[in-house]
A protein has these predicted regions:
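Short, Lys/Arg-rich, polar N-terminal cytosolic tail immediately upstream
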Residues: 1-14
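Alpha-helical transmembrane segments and their helix-start/interface "positive-inside/aromatic belt" motifs
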Residues: 14-31, 159-176, 240-255, 322-325
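Hydrophobic alpha-helical membrane-insertion segments
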Residues: 28-39, 168-187, 248-274
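Long, glycine/tryptophan/cysteine-rich extracytoplasmic
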Residues: 36-139, 182-218, 265-306
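Hydrophobic alpha-helical transmembrane segments
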Residues: 138-157, 174-177, 219-236, 310-320
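Membrane-proximal helix-loop-helix units in multi-pass membrane proteins
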Residues: 163-171, 187-253
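Membrane-interface capping segments at transmembrane-helix boundaries
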Residues: 324-335
Length: 339
């Protein structure tokens, strides 16, 4: 039989509980905000990209759900402003590939410099695949895992056991239904795989090989959805059976900054160690810069956290403090039951 929660404890315990809820709420809001924010930025600079035309270099932003353009409209009067049609662009803007679309009228509907394509063009000369082909399973599932964490945090803020299980059950059911409908019923998985295959074959035309990659993406994404549903079931059962299991509902989301860095570094390693032999220039496999400044040939690289990563750190810090406070409460409850 589970020990009764300390909802009727003294003023000190009630104050602790309110603090736990406040910290968890701050963490929840910070993580939701981080999903829509750039987490990391990377920039390339070189002599052939003058600072007047490219004040931030060739810059891209990594979000939890993909890679976005990091270049902004040029300052009026600068070289870039004089030579191109200017406008800030985002992931929904029509794009032109500077290699494959060389014969197109690039001024038609032009919106300015797209640094994602610019960096892809630079990278393909050494045999690197387009950046957006990285994390092809993680990106479309990111929103569901963030929702999974949000439900756990919401439940962690609830002290009463039945209410907590209800929050977990309803929340997890909603996330599972959302994932299934989004990926399979609405066909977003199929459209994602199609876009992945097209992007992967942008520079290196090996249709059979790349289609096999697309099939793997479809398979692993289905496995990912299954793992997500299984993880939700394990959490619900764990909270139902074990009192101390509730601490994992704060610990796992608190590790999000670590998860991101490991994922980011792993995919950088993949890109640097899986260079296509058709690249115009031959370079040895290398590890791109994860944090700080580096140099590859004439290019200087810069890789640093963006404000979205700070939001993840805020969420992590709040959750760890809330976890320690809740752990202290659980120990007090255990000691009281033995007295």
């Amino acid at each position: 039989m589970s020990a009764a929660p300390a909802t009727s404890a003294g003023p000190a315990t009630r104050k602790q509980t309110r603090l736990i809820r406040l910290l968890t709420l701050v963490a929840l809001l910070a993580m939701v905000a981080a999903y829509f924010a750039p987490i990391w930025w990377v920039s390339l600079t070189a002599p052939n990209y003058p600072k007047d035309a490219f004040p931030d270099g060739i810059r891209i932003h990594f979000h939890l759900d993909g890679v976005h353009n990091g270049c902004k409209a040029a300052v009026k009067g600068s070289q870039l402003a004089n030579e191109t049609i200017q406008d800030d662009i985002d992931k929904d803007t029509e794009r032109y590939n500077p290699v494959l679309d060389a014969k197109k009228d690039l001024n038609k509907n032009a919106k300015g410099l797209d640094c994602v394509h610019e960096m892809n063009t630079i990278n393909h000369y050494v045999g690197m695949f387009p950046i957006s082909t990285g994390a092809p399973v993680e990106k479309p599932l990111a929103k569901f895992f963030v929702a999974f964490f949000v439900v756990m945090m919401a439940a962690f803020a609830v002290i009463e056991r039945r209410a907590r299980l209800a929050v977990l059950g309803l929340g997890f059911a909603a996330v599972a239904a959302w994932a299934v409908v989004d990926q399979f019923v609405l066909g977003h998985l199929a459209s994602h795989v199609k876009a992945y295959v097209e992007e992967a074959g942008t520079f290196f035309k090996e249709p059979e090989k790349i289609q096999a990659w697309g099939d793997n993406v479809a398979l692993y994404t289905k496995v990912g959805v299954g793992v997500l549903v299984a993880a939700m079931a394990v959490v619900w059962l764990g909270v139902w059976k074990l009192r101390s299991f509730e601490l994992l509902m704060a610990l796992v989301p608190a590790l999000m900054p670590l998860f991101f860095v490991l994922e980011y570094a792993g995919w950088l390693w993949f890109f640097g160690h899986n260079l296509h032999p058709w690249g115009a220039f031959t370079v040895k496999p290398f590890m791109p810069t994860v944090f700080g400044e580096g140099k590859v040939a004439q290019f200087s690289t810069f890789s640093y956290p963006h404000y979205g990563y700070a939001l993840l750190l805020v969420a992590s810090g709040c959750l760890l403090v809330a976890l320690l406070l809740r752990r202290k409460q659980l120990r007090s409850e255990a000691a009281g039951s033995l007295a």
